[in-house]
């Protein structure tokens, strides 16, 4: 195999201070009730992002069979997790919200808002997609986006991960990266507007450049499960954004990574290097 293939978003990592409470919450509200794996071992490969030494962690990957990527729920086992010292605001640098699949935004909002108050009324994304925002029990923000596709119908209103909302400093360079390297080459919208009609997340009423990117139909063994996904890039125009993970480790509370399902990682590594984005960590260098 000389070419690489990206089949979709396999999972998005969520660092937490309490593994079991987070997972139970994701099961109860988002239906992430199928365990793919769970272990409590040492993370040895991410040394540039874990203080230069291996770190013990308890993690699992859980999915919702309605379709979409999974949750990688991740907690340090022997190190006290370092929470973000400031309240994360719209446009801060890194993943500040995860996109979650929802077959009926209005119906799910009605259901969930009866028991969970940290959510906004439905609105629309700049590309016209119905959505609403919801914080989990530790303040991680999820953007519920309407997507009526179903992998296995379990009569749930939610599915899995279908993208991320990412704060950036240089929109044009970021669009080029996600388009050329990760295949998000379809620009669904490129606009300047406020982020939300509501203020679940600080600075939602400020002006931002927002670009929503989609990919052509993905192929691969699990592409049908993962489904379509989008990347929403957000650049602050009226404030200086902060780095969400400055002074902290990978695995600390928050959204820690987007994991793509890749065939032929060596070919992808070569391609990334040619594009000026060499791997910073390679779990299988040989």
Which sequence ranges carry the predicted segments?
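Vicinal oxygen chelate
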Residues: 1-5, 11-14, 35-41, 45-46, ...
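Conserved active-site tyrosine of GNAT-family acetyltransferases
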Residues: 22-27, 112, 139, 174-179, ...
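Post-signal peptide N-terminal segment of secreted/secretory-pathway proteins
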Residues: 52, 81-86, 90-92, 103
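Eukaryotic phosphotyrosine signaling hubs
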Residues: 93-97, 161-162, 253-256
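Repeat-solenoid scaffold signature
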Residues: 165-174
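Phosphate-binding active sites in nucleotide-utilizing proteins
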Residues: 184-186
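Flexible internal linker/loop segments at domain or repeat junctions
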Residues: 204-205, 212-213, 223-250
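Low-complexity, glycine/alanine/valine/leucine- and proline-rich hydrophobic stretches
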Residues: 238, 251-260
């Amino acid at each position: 195999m000389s070419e690489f293939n990206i089949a979709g978003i396999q999972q998005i990592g969520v660092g937490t201070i309490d593994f079991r409470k987070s997972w139970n919450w994701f099961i109860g509200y988002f239906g992430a009730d199928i365990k793919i794996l769970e272990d409590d071992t040492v993370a040895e490969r991410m040394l540039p992002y874990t203080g230069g030494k291996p770190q013990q962690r308890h993690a699992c990957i859980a999915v919702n069979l309605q379709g979409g990527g999974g949750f990688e729920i991740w907690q340090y086992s022997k190190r006290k997790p370092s929470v973000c010292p400031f309240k994360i605001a719209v446009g801060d640098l890194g993943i500040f919200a995860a996109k979650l699949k929802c077959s009926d935004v209005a119906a799910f909002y009605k259901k969930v808002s009866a028991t969970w108050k940290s959510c906004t009324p439905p609105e629309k994304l700049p590309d016209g997609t119905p959505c609403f925002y919801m914080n989990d029990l530790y303040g991680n923000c999820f953007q519920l986006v309407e997507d009526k596709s179903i992998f296995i119908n379990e009569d749930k209103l939610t599915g899995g991960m279908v993208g991320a909302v990412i704060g950036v400093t240089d929109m044009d360079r970021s669009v080029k990266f996600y388009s050329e390297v990760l295949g998000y080459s379809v620009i669904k919208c490129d606009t300047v507007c406020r982020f939300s009609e509501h203020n679940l997340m600080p600075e939602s009423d400020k002006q931002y450049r927002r670009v929503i990117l989609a990919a052509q139909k993905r192929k691969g063994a699990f592409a049908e499960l993962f489904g379509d996904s989008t990347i929403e890039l957000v650049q602050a125009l009226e404030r200086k954004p902060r780095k969400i993970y400055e002074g902290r480790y990978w695995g600390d509370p928050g959204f820690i990574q987007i994991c793509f399902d890749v065939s032929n990682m060596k070919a992808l590594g070569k391609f990334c290097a040619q594009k000026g984005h060499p791997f910073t960590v390679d779990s299988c260098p040989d």
